[in-house]
Design a protein with these regions (language model features):
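Conserved donor-binding/catalytic core segment of Leloir-type glycosyltransferases
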Residues: 5, 166-186, 192-196
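A charged, aromatic-enriched C-terminal amphipathic alpha-helix characteristic of glycosyltransferases
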Residues: 18-21, 291-326
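Membrane-proximal helix-turn-helix segments that form the acceptor-binding/catalytic region
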Residues: 60, 97, 106-124
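Short His-centered aromatic/hydrophobic patch
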Residues: 71-76, 93
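A short, active-site helix/loop in glycosyltransferases that binds the activated sugar's phosphate group
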Residues: 115-142, 147, 151
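Aromatic "clamp/platform" in nucleotide-sugar-dependent glycosyltransferases that forms part
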Residues: 235
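Short hydrophobic beta-strand element within catalytic cores of glycosyltransferases
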Residues: 252-255
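Conserved acidic donor-binding segment of nucleotide-sugar-dependent glycosyltransferases
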Residues: 267-279, 288-293
Protein backbone atom coordinates (compact mmCIF):
# COMPACT_ATOMS: atom_id res chain seq x y z
CA UNK A 1 0.00 0.00 0.00
CA UNK A 2 1.11 3.55 -0.71
CA UNK A 3 3.00 5.53 1.95
CA UNK A 4 2.34 9.27 2.29
CA UNK A 5 4.07 12.01 4.28
CA UNK A 6 1.68 14.86 5.05
CA UNK A 7 3.05 18.37 5.54
CA UNK A 8 0.53 20.86 6.88
CA UNK A 9 0.38 24.24 8.59
CA UNK A 10 -3.13 23.54 9.91
CA UNK A 11 -3.61 20.74 12.43
CA UNK A 12 -5.27 20.49 15.86
CA UNK A 13 -2.97 21.26 18.78
CA UNK A 14 -3.32 22.13 22.45
CA UNK A 15 -5.13 25.43 22.67
CA UNK A 16 -6.72 25.12 19.22
CA UNK A 17 -8.42 21.75 19.02
CA UNK A 18 -10.44 22.55 15.89
CA UNK A 19 -7.59 24.09 13.86
CA UNK A 20 -7.15 22.08 10.67
CA UNK A 21 -9.43 19.33 11.96
CA UNK A 22 -10.65 18.68 8.41
CA UNK A 23 -7.10 17.87 7.31
CA UNK A 24 -6.66 15.56 10.30
CA UNK A 25 -9.89 13.78 9.43
CA UNK A 26 -8.90 13.45 5.75
CA UNK A 27 -5.60 11.86 6.78
CA UNK A 28 -7.42 9.45 9.09
CA UNK A 29 -9.90 8.53 6.36
CA UNK A 30 -7.05 7.69 3.97
CA UNK A 31 -5.39 5.64 6.70
CA UNK A 32 -8.63 3.68 7.09
CA UNK A 33 -8.26 2.73 3.41
CA UNK A 34 -4.78 1.38 4.02
CA UNK A 35 -2.55 4.41 3.43
CA UNK A 36 0.49 4.42 5.71
CA UNK A 37 1.19 8.00 6.77
CA UNK A 38 2.97 10.43 9.06
CA UNK A 39 2.36 14.15 9.57
CA UNK A 40 4.71 17.12 9.86
CA UNK A 41 2.85 20.04 11.44
CA UNK A 42 4.40 23.44 10.76
CA UNK A 43 2.90 25.69 13.43
CA UNK A 44 3.19 29.01 11.64
CA UNK A 45 0.62 30.47 14.00
CA UNK A 46 3.09 30.41 16.87
CA UNK A 47 6.41 30.19 15.03
CA UNK A 48 5.72 32.59 12.17
CA UNK A 49 7.42 32.27 8.78
CA UNK A 50 10.62 31.00 10.46
CA UNK A 51 8.76 27.79 11.33
CA UNK A 52 8.60 26.93 7.63
CA UNK A 53 12.34 27.35 7.15
CA UNK A 54 13.12 25.33 10.27
CA UNK A 55 10.96 22.44 9.02
CA UNK A 56 13.03 21.74 5.90
CA UNK A 57 15.50 19.24 7.34
CA UNK A 58 12.76 17.28 9.10
CA UNK A 59 10.66 17.13 5.93
CA UNK A 60 13.66 15.98 3.88
CA UNK A 61 14.61 13.26 6.37
CA UNK A 62 11.12 11.84 6.85
CA UNK A 63 10.20 11.98 3.16
CA UNK A 64 12.83 9.35 2.34
CA UNK A 65 10.61 6.72 4.01
CA UNK A 66 7.53 7.60 1.93
CA UNK A 67 6.32 7.29 -1.66
CA UNK A 68 4.48 10.62 -1.90
CA UNK A 69 4.49 13.93 -0.04
CA UNK A 70 1.10 15.66 0.32
CA UNK A 71 1.36 19.35 1.22
CA UNK A 72 -1.74 20.98 2.66
CA UNK A 73 -1.64 24.74 1.91
CA UNK A 74 0.67 26.66 -0.40
CA UNK A 75 3.13 27.60 2.35
CA UNK A 76 3.55 23.94 3.32
CA UNK A 77 4.30 23.23 -0.32
CA UNK A 78 6.90 25.98 -0.58
CA UNK A 79 8.66 24.67 2.55
CA UNK A 80 8.66 21.16 1.06
CA UNK A 81 9.99 22.43 -2.26
CA UNK A 82 12.94 23.94 -0.37
CA UNK A 83 13.45 20.62 1.44
CA UNK A 84 14.41 18.93 -1.86
CA UNK A 85 12.79 15.59 -1.01
CA UNK A 86 13.02 14.09 -4.49
CA UNK A 87 9.56 12.57 -3.97
CA UNK A 88 6.36 13.01 -6.02
CA UNK A 89 4.28 15.80 -4.51
CA UNK A 90 0.63 16.73 -4.09
CA UNK A 91 -0.22 20.34 -3.21
CA UNK A 92 -3.69 21.10 -1.85
CA UNK A 93 -4.92 24.69 -2.00
CA UNK A 94 -7.19 25.31 0.98
CA UNK A 95 -8.85 28.44 -0.38
CA UNK A 96 -9.26 30.32 -3.66
CA UNK A 97 -6.32 31.37 -5.83
CA UNK A 98 -4.57 33.76 -5.06
CA UNK A 99 -5.91 34.22 -1.51
CA UNK A 100 -3.95 31.11 -0.49
CA UNK A 101 -0.89 33.36 -0.05
CA UNK A 102 -2.31 34.91 3.11
CA UNK A 103 -0.50 37.68 4.93
CA UNK A 104 0.83 39.24 1.73
CA UNK A 105 -0.76 42.49 0.58
CA UNK A 106 0.57 42.62 -2.98
CA UNK A 107 -1.70 40.74 -5.38
CA UNK A 108 1.24 40.41 -7.77
CA UNK A 109 3.34 38.74 -5.06
CA UNK A 110 0.47 36.45 -4.11
CA UNK A 111 0.01 35.37 -7.70
CA UNK A 112 3.74 34.77 -8.09
CA UNK A 113 3.91 32.51 -5.03
CA UNK A 114 0.87 30.55 -6.17
CA UNK A 115 2.42 30.15 -9.62
CA UNK A 116 5.68 28.86 -8.12
CA UNK A 117 3.73 26.36 -6.01
CA UNK A 118 1.68 24.89 -8.84
CA UNK A 119 4.72 24.73 -11.14
CA UNK A 120 6.65 22.73 -8.51
CA UNK A 121 3.98 20.18 -7.54
CA UNK A 122 3.22 17.03 -9.52
CA UNK A 123 -0.50 17.23 -8.72
CA UNK A 124 -2.44 20.26 -7.48
CA UNK A 125 -5.78 19.87 -5.73
CA UNK A 126 -8.25 22.73 -5.54
CA UNK A 127 -11.23 22.54 -3.18
CA UNK A 128 -13.00 25.11 -5.36
CA UNK A 129 -13.13 25.08 -9.18
CA UNK A 130 -9.71 24.95 -10.84
CA UNK A 131 -8.62 28.43 -12.06
CA UNK A 132 -9.33 28.72 -15.77
CA UNK A 133 -5.73 29.47 -16.73
CA UNK A 134 -4.56 26.10 -15.35
CA UNK A 135 -5.53 23.89 -18.26
CA UNK A 136 -3.90 20.49 -17.64
CA UNK A 137 -6.75 18.30 -16.30
CA UNK A 138 -4.36 15.54 -15.21
CA UNK A 139 -2.27 17.84 -13.03
CA UNK A 140 -4.92 20.26 -11.76
CA UNK A 141 -7.78 18.54 -9.95
CA UNK A 142 -10.98 19.75 -8.31
CA UNK A 143 -11.42 17.63 -5.18
CA UNK A 144 -13.21 19.20 -2.20
CA UNK A 145 -13.04 17.67 1.26
CA UNK A 146 -15.63 15.00 1.91
CA UNK A 147 -18.08 15.13 4.79
CA UNK A 148 -18.50 12.33 7.33
CA UNK A 149 -22.10 11.39 6.63
CA UNK A 150 -22.11 8.80 9.43
CA UNK A 151 -21.40 11.50 12.03
CA UNK A 152 -23.31 14.46 10.60
CA UNK A 153 -27.02 13.76 10.31
CA UNK A 154 -30.45 15.07 11.19
CA UNK A 155 -30.99 15.53 14.93
CA UNK A 156 -33.85 16.80 17.03
CA UNK A 157 -33.69 20.60 17.07
CA UNK A 158 -35.37 21.02 20.43
CA UNK A 159 -32.98 18.66 22.18
CA UNK A 160 -29.97 20.35 20.59
CA UNK A 161 -31.19 23.76 21.74
CA UNK A 162 -31.73 22.45 25.24
CA UNK A 163 -28.16 21.14 25.39
CA UNK A 164 -26.80 24.48 24.15
CA UNK A 165 -29.04 26.54 26.43
CA UNK A 166 -30.83 28.29 23.55
CA UNK A 167 -34.29 29.84 23.26
CA UNK A 168 -36.70 27.30 21.79
CA UNK A 169 -38.75 29.98 19.99
CA UNK A 170 -36.07 32.17 18.39
CA UNK A 171 -34.83 31.85 14.80
CA UNK A 172 -31.08 31.23 14.84
CA UNK A 173 -28.69 32.20 12.05
CA UNK A 174 -25.52 30.11 12.22
CA UNK A 175 -22.10 31.74 11.70
CA UNK A 176 -19.07 29.43 11.48
CA UNK A 177 -15.37 30.29 11.69
CA UNK A 178 -12.56 28.07 12.94
CA UNK A 179 -10.25 31.02 13.67
CA UNK A 180 -12.64 33.38 15.44
CA UNK A 181 -15.59 35.41 14.24
CA UNK A 182 -13.59 38.60 13.59
CA UNK A 183 -11.49 36.94 10.86
CA UNK A 184 -11.78 39.52 8.02
CA UNK A 185 -12.41 36.94 5.27
CA UNK A 186 -15.55 35.69 7.03
CA UNK A 187 -17.28 39.11 7.01
CA UNK A 188 -18.99 38.95 10.36
CA UNK A 189 -20.08 42.54 9.68
CA UNK A 190 -22.17 41.37 6.72
CA UNK A 191 -23.62 38.56 8.83
CA UNK A 192 -24.71 40.89 11.64
CA UNK A 193 -26.07 43.48 9.20
CA UNK A 194 -28.23 40.75 7.64
CA UNK A 195 -29.48 39.70 11.06
CA UNK A 196 -30.29 43.32 11.92
CA UNK A 197 -32.15 43.78 8.65
CA UNK A 198 -34.29 40.72 9.38
CA UNK A 199 -35.09 41.95 12.89
CA UNK A 200 -35.99 45.38 11.54
CA UNK A 201 -38.48 43.76 9.20
CA UNK A 202 -39.90 41.61 11.99
CA UNK A 203 -40.21 44.56 14.37
CA UNK A 204 -38.55 42.74 17.26
CA UNK A 205 -35.54 40.52 18.01
CA UNK A 206 -36.89 37.48 16.21
CA UNK A 207 -33.57 36.47 14.63
CA UNK A 208 -30.51 35.71 16.72
CA UNK A 209 -26.94 34.77 15.93
CA UNK A 210 -25.47 31.40 16.81
CA UNK A 211 -21.66 31.48 16.68
CA UNK A 212 -19.83 28.22 16.03
CA UNK A 213 -16.21 29.02 16.86
CA UNK A 214 -13.55 26.69 18.32
CA UNK A 215 -15.89 23.94 19.50
CA UNK A 216 -15.09 20.22 19.98
CA UNK A 217 -16.22 17.99 17.12
CA UNK A 218 -18.72 16.11 19.28
CA UNK A 219 -20.49 19.41 20.06
CA UNK A 220 -20.47 20.88 16.55
CA UNK A 221 -23.38 18.79 15.32
CA UNK A 222 -25.67 20.31 17.97
CA UNK A 223 -25.05 23.75 16.45
CA UNK A 224 -26.18 22.53 13.03
CA UNK A 225 -29.21 20.86 14.58
CA UNK A 226 -30.15 23.90 16.68
CA UNK A 227 -29.86 26.52 13.93
CA UNK A 228 -32.54 27.47 11.41
CA UNK A 229 -30.21 28.67 8.62
CA UNK A 230 -26.46 28.60 8.01
CA UNK A 231 -25.56 32.03 6.61
CA UNK A 232 -22.14 32.13 4.89
CA UNK A 233 -21.08 35.75 4.40
CA UNK A 234 -17.41 35.23 3.42
CA UNK A 235 -15.55 37.23 0.77
CA UNK A 236 -13.76 34.07 -0.40
CA UNK A 237 -13.54 30.37 0.45
CA UNK A 238 -12.27 27.14 -1.05
CA UNK A 239 -14.88 24.50 -0.40
CA UNK A 240 -16.36 25.54 2.96
CA UNK A 241 -16.70 22.47 5.15
CA UNK A 242 -19.37 24.14 7.25
CA UNK A 243 -21.70 24.20 4.23
CA UNK A 244 -21.22 20.47 3.62
CA UNK A 245 -21.74 19.63 7.27
CA UNK A 246 -24.82 21.85 7.45
CA UNK A 247 -26.38 20.22 4.39
CA UNK A 248 -25.52 16.76 5.70
CA UNK A 249 -27.50 17.71 8.81
CA UNK A 250 -30.35 18.97 6.62
CA UNK A 251 -29.81 22.60 7.64
CA UNK A 252 -30.89 25.21 5.05
CA UNK A 253 -28.02 27.32 3.67
CA UNK A 254 -27.79 30.87 2.33
CA UNK A 255 -24.37 31.74 0.96
CA UNK A 256 -22.48 34.26 -1.06
CA UNK A 257 -21.10 32.88 -4.32
CA UNK A 258 -17.64 31.82 -3.10
CA UNK A 259 -15.47 28.77 -3.73
CA UNK A 260 -17.51 25.81 -4.93
CA UNK A 261 -20.66 26.73 -3.00
CA UNK A 262 -22.75 27.34 -6.12
CA UNK A 263 -21.99 23.80 -7.34
CA UNK A 264 -22.79 22.31 -3.93
CA UNK A 265 -26.11 24.14 -3.58
CA UNK A 266 -27.31 23.78 -7.17
CA UNK A 267 -30.57 21.85 -7.32
CA UNK A 268 -30.95 21.50 -3.55
CA UNK A 269 -34.10 22.47 -1.66
CA UNK A 270 -33.83 25.27 0.89
CA UNK A 271 -30.43 26.44 -0.41
CA UNK A 272 -29.62 29.77 -2.07
CA UNK A 273 -26.41 31.26 -3.52
CA UNK A 274 -26.09 35.01 -4.10
CA UNK A 275 -23.42 36.96 -5.92
CA UNK A 276 -23.81 39.82 -3.45
CA UNK A 277 -22.80 41.06 0.00
CA UNK A 278 -25.92 43.25 0.28
CA UNK A 279 -27.59 42.50 3.65
CA UNK A 280 -31.00 43.29 2.17
CA UNK A 281 -30.60 40.65 -0.52
CA UNK A 282 -29.18 38.14 1.94
CA UNK A 283 -32.14 38.80 4.25
CA UNK A 284 -34.50 38.15 1.33
CA UNK A 285 -32.78 34.81 0.74
CA UNK A 286 -33.03 33.83 4.41
CA UNK A 287 -36.76 34.54 4.38
CA UNK A 288 -37.04 32.55 1.15
CA UNK A 289 -35.44 29.35 2.47
CA UNK A 290 -37.33 29.59 5.77
CA UNK A 291 -40.56 29.78 3.80
CA UNK A 292 -39.90 26.58 1.84
CA UNK A 293 -41.53 23.37 3.00
CA UNK A 294 -38.88 20.68 2.37
CA UNK A 295 -37.83 18.94 5.59
CA UNK A 296 -34.27 18.31 6.73
CA UNK A 297 -34.18 14.72 5.55
CA UNK A 298 -34.95 15.94 2.02
CA UNK A 299 -32.13 18.50 2.16
CA UNK A 300 -29.69 15.85 3.40
CA UNK A 301 -30.69 13.28 0.78
CA UNK A 302 -30.36 15.76 -2.09
CA UNK A 303 -26.92 16.80 -0.88
CA UNK A 304 -25.58 13.27 -0.41
CA UNK A 305 -26.61 12.44 -3.97
CA UNK A 306 -23.81 14.79 -5.12
CA UNK A 307 -21.12 12.31 -4.02
CA UNK A 308 -19.36 14.56 -1.53
CA UNK A 309 -19.33 12.00 1.27
CA UNK A 310 -15.97 11.28 2.85
CA UNK A 311 -15.55 7.73 1.53
CA UNK A 312 -16.13 8.72 -2.11
CA UNK A 313 -13.73 11.67 -1.89
CA UNK A 314 -11.06 9.68 -0.04
CA UNK A 315 -11.10 6.92 -2.66
CA UNK A 316 -10.33 9.52 -5.32
CA UNK A 317 -7.53 10.99 -3.22
CA UNK A 318 -5.95 7.58 -2.62
CA UNK A 319 -6.11 6.98 -6.37
CA UNK A 320 -3.97 10.09 -6.89
CA UNK A 321 -1.42 8.83 -4.36
CA UNK A 322 -1.27 5.41 -6.01
CA UNK A 323 -0.82 6.87 -9.48
CA UNK A 324 2.10 9.04 -8.37
CA UNK A 325 3.73 6.18 -6.45
CA UNK A 326 3.53 3.88 -9.48
CA UNK A 327 5.04 6.56 -11.71
CA UNK A 328 7.97 7.05 -9.33
CA UNK A 329 8.75 3.31 -9.35
CA UNK A 330 9.14 3.11 -13.14
Amino acid sequence: MVRVLHVTNAFPYEGSIDYGVFIKEQIEAARDLGVESETVFINGREGGKKAYLKSRSKIHELAQKYDVVHCHHLYSGLATALALTGKPSVLSFLTDWPYEAEGINSMMARTLLCTIGVHWADRVIFKSPVPKHLTDPKKFINLPNGVDETHFGVRDRGEARRRLGLDQDAIYLLFVSSKGYHRPQKRYDVFTATRDQLNERAGYEKYRELLLVKQPRDVVIDYFAAADVHLLSSDFEGSPNSVKEALCCGLPVVSRDVGNVRDMLEGLPRAVTLDSADPNLLADAVEDVLGQSADREAVRAAFLAKGLDRHSITRRLVGIYEELARGAQR
